[in-house]
């Protein structure tokens, strides 16, 4: 009998006895089974064997459970090492005063290493990935039209919780509703989070995230649907953009397209939505959004466009990229403190920006947006200040009067070696995450603007073997269950600190990436 080159003779004998011990209860019921057992016994433990020692009961099962316990212990220790390494990295991020200080508080949590990998099949490139708004569940949209769901607390990442055969062609985007909704308008039913998927098969589909039930299909686009985003002010509305150059607004209750407008001359790649209702404010968590939503879109025409959703009116154009723009996002209001300080202290660099505009409260009290960030095939990310629209009572907003309705480029984020395909924003508004075809994720610190005058990459995450197509940082619950108020006499700094404390208590330290290497990675 050929001996294992890995095990010693003693270990080989113990393994053979354990196999016989495990099989014995199954092979003693019939005469034929007993014959099989005797044959195995002759092979595994022949009479000539020098070892006659017995082994403990349930030897194989006990060995197996011990291995599993040790594997879990190794994972726990690896996570602990990763956490300690991130703390050391944070302490070393200050070098001769040339970088901003990153504290070890939870509010500044940053991913450091891939702790879990969720694989798909060979023909399932991950094109979109998203984290459930409240549950430890992640969703991946694949190139074959499948939506795959994993529970991240499960030890076996190779077994998904659900596979949904959603579309006939590649999925381009997955998006969750801002809050639970009931599209049936049946008051007796409990509300649940819904999510939307859009595809190259020209359709958008709406799903119940608790049962994975298909609710509705939206059709009307004439070409690939690139991206979708839920309304911030109306939970029943969804926005979509397409290669047919249009932006469409959908009523999810009846499935009708209620508005369609064209603002770009080529393929519209991405969309993000903002309203005064979406901007976190401790003084009033649910502000009435009289103007409704504002949307920002990007296109193959190398421009970023800010529009008023209800009227479709173009309000501002951001020009500066030299190639296709893949992604764009509004920055949250919590980012304003950092960027406002930079503009106020460096006014000479931006003579065309009126000083009073930087401090204008219209952005937070009326509009819900001020800055945005875009990334494209020129390997760059760009930070923009968006000029406010012209507001006339009882009329839709009109194009901005400042700077000929064009936005101001504040800073370029330089570091990627290939196309920037994904952008995510940290809940604290300070850190930007970008994913690229160079197979890396970069973490950018906006606070460096006020130290070095540029946005520095403070961390590069490597681990994927393919183009990175999507990123997501877990959302946090804006509803606190109690009234959160800022003192009327609080200074701007005190207000900001209280806002950070609010976010810190509700943020979830979950960050994922989806890539063309057939995997989603969870970073810790």
Curated annotation (Swiss-Prot):
Domain of life of the source: Eukaryota
Record carries keyword Cell cycle: yes
Gene3D superfamilies in UniProt: 1.20.960.30, YVTN repeat-like/Quinoprotein amine dehydrogenase (2.130.10.10)
WD repeats: 121-160, 166-217, 220-262, 277-317, 353-394, 415-454, 463-492, 493-524
Keywords (A to Z) from UniProt: Cell cycle, Cell division, Coiled coil, Cytoplasm, Cytoskeleton, Microtubule, Mitosis, Repeat, Transport, WD repeat
TM region positions: none
Any one Gene Ontology cellular component term annotated for this protein: spindle pole
Subcellular location: Cytoplasm, Cytoskeleton; Cytoplasm, Cytoskeleton, Spindle pole
Coiled-coil region(s): 65-90
CDD domains for this protein: WD40
Record carries keyword Transport: yes
GO MF, one example: dynein complex binding
Assigned protein family: Belongs to the WD repeat LIS1/nudF family.
Record-linked PANTHER family: F-BOX DOMAIN-CONTAINING PROTEIN, WD40 REPEAT PF20
Role played: Positively regulates the activity of the minus-end directed microtubule motor protein dynein. Plays a central role in positioning the mitotic spindle at the bud neck during cell division. Targets cytoplasmic dynein to microtubule plus ends, thereby promoting dynein-mediated microtubule sliding along the bud cortex and consequently the movement of the mitotic spindle to the bud neck.
Quaternary structure and interacting proteins, as annotated: Self-associates. Interacts with NDL1 and dynein.
Name used for this protein in its record: Nuclear distribution protein PAC1
Source organism of this protein record: Scheffersomyces stipitis (strain ATCC 58785 / CBS 6054 / NBRC 10063 / NRRL Y-11545) (Yeast)
């Amino acid at each position: 009998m050929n001996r294992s080159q890995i095990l010693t003779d003693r270990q080989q004998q113990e393994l053979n006895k354990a196999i016989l011990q495990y099989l014995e209860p199954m092979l003693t019921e019939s005469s034929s089974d007993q014959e099989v057992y005797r044959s195995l016994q002759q092979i595994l433990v022949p009479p000539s064997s020098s070892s006659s020692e017995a082994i403990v009961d349930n030897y194989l099962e006990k060995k197996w459970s011990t291995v599993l316990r040790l594997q879990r212990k190794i994972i726990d220790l690896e996570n602990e090492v990763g956490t300690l390494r991130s703390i050391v990295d944070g302490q070393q991020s200050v070098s001769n005063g040339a970088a901003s200080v990153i504290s070890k508080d939870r509010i500044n949590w940053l991913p450091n290493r891939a702790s879990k990998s969720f694989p798909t099949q060979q023909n399932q490139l991950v094109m979109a990935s998203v984290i459930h708004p409240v549950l430890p569940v992640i969703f991946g949209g694949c190139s074959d039209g499948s939506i795959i769901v994993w529970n991240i607390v499960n030890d076996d990442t190779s077994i998904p919780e659900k596979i949904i055969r959603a579309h006939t062609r590649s999925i381009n985007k997955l998006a969750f509703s801002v809050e639970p909704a009931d599209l049936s308008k049946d008051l007796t039913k409990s509300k649940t989070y819904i999510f939307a998927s859009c595809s190259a098969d020209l359709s958008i589909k709406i799903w119940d995230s608790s049962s994975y039930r298909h609710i509705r299909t939206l059709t009307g686009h004439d070409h690939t649907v690139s991206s979708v985003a839920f309304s911030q002010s109306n939970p029943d509305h969804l926005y979509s953009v397409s290669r047919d150059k249009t932006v469409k607004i959908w009523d999810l209750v009846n499935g009708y397209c209620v508005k369609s407008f064209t603002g770009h001359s080529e393929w519209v790649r991405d969309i993000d939505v903002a309203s005064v209702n979406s901007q976190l404010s401790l003084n009033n968590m649910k502000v009435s959004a009289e103007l409704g939503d504002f949307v920002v879109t990007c296109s193959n025409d190398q421009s970023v466009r800010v529009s008023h959703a209800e009227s479709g009116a173009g309000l501002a154009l951001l020009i500066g990229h030299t190639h296709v723009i893949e992604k764009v996002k509004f920055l949250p209001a919590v980012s304003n403190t950092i960027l406002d300080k930079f503009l106020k202290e460096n006014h000479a660099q931006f003579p065309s920006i009126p000083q009073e505009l930087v401090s204008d409260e219209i952005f937070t009290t009326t509009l819900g947006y001020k800055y945005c960030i875009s990334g494209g095939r020129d390997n760059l990310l760009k930070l923009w200040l968006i000029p406010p629209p012209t507001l006339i009572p009882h009329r839709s907003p009109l194009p901005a009067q400042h700077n000929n309705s064009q936005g101001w480029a504040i800073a370029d984020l330089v570091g990627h070696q290939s196309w920037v395909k994904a952008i995510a924003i940290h809940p604290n508004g300070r850190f930007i995450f970008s994913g690229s075809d160079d197979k890396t994720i970069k973490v950018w610190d906006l606070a460096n603007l006020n130290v070095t005058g540029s946005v520095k990459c403070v961390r590069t995450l490597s681990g994927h073997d393919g183009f990175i197509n999507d990123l997501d940082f877990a959302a946090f619950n804006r509803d606190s269950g109690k009234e959160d108020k800022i003192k009327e006499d609080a200074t701007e700094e005190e207000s900001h600190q209280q806002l950070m404390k609010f976010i810190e208590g509700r943020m979830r330290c979950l960050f994922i990436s989806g890539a063309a290497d057939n995997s989603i990675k969870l970073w810790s």
